[in-house]
């Protein structure tokens, strides 16, 4: 464990630090989220024997244990595998069937596919600046059967300048320092640094400044803790 990170976390959550450290080494929980564009809950519950209790974050998802990426129903887009709490962000957005939505940092596509499942005559723009990740995003959208959408691979400033106030809702799952990945990858614990946090915070601030020009309602999702993380960034950008 990175000593600088450990010291920082002890300052933020002194009474919970032991539980937090234990949680990093606990088995990673995963959920299977139903894709309403292709199926319904009753069908999946009748076919997928590995579904466990319903997710507390999404009424259309179940906790699962194991590896099901090669399951035929996953391969054909009937469900999407993601961490349970990840689906809570889109649920909080109150997506309406006719909304025009922008997912500004969209790859690999879990939240975009969830948004698409709530749209009827609305439209989704899913953007990913890195071309290779944009290809993964497009592949996942095709697998999930999403139609009323487009995938872009643009700088956020260029995209948002071209589409001022065009969106009813915007989601920014901004690149961050990787603290949310520490449970998955040991390297994220070792490579953490304050310099990287400052770099990520500057990048996030730029993305948010671009995004607000294109929005009606804005939703920010970050896993970074501290004054240079979610709270401080929101205070700088939200009136």
Predicted regions and their residues:
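S-adenosylmethionine
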Residues: 1-239
């Amino acid at each position: 464990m990175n000593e600088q990170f450990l010291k920082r976390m002890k300052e933020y959550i002194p009474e919970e630090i032991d539980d937090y450290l234990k949680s990093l080494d606990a088995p990673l929980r995963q959920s299977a989220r139903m894709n309403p564009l292709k199926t319904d809950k009753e069908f999946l519950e009748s076919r997928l024997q590995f579904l466990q209790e319903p997710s507390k974050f999404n009424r259309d998802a179940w906790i699962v244990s194991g590896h099901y990426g090669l399951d035929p129903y996953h391969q054909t887009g009937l469900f999407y595998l993601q961490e349970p709490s990840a689906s809570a962000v889109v649920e909080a957005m109150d997506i309406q069937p006719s909304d025009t939505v922008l997912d500004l940092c969209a790859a690999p596509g879990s939240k975009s596919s969830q948004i698409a499942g709530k749209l009827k005559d609305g439209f989704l723009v899913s953007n990913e600046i890195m071309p290779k990740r944009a290809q993964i995003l497009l592949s996942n959208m095709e697998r999930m059967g999403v139609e009323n959408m487009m995938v872009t691979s643009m700088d956020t400033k260029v995209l948002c300048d071209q589409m001022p106030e065009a969106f009813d809702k915007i989601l920014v799952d901004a690149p961050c320092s990787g603290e949310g990945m520490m449970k998955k990858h040991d390297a994220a614990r070792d490579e953490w640094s304050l310099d990287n946090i400052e770099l990520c915070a500057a990048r996030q601030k730029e993305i948010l400044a671009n995004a607000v020009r294109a929005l009606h309602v804005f939703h920010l999702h970050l896993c970074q803790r501290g004054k240079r993380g979610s709270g401080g960034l929101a205070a700088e950008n939200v009136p």
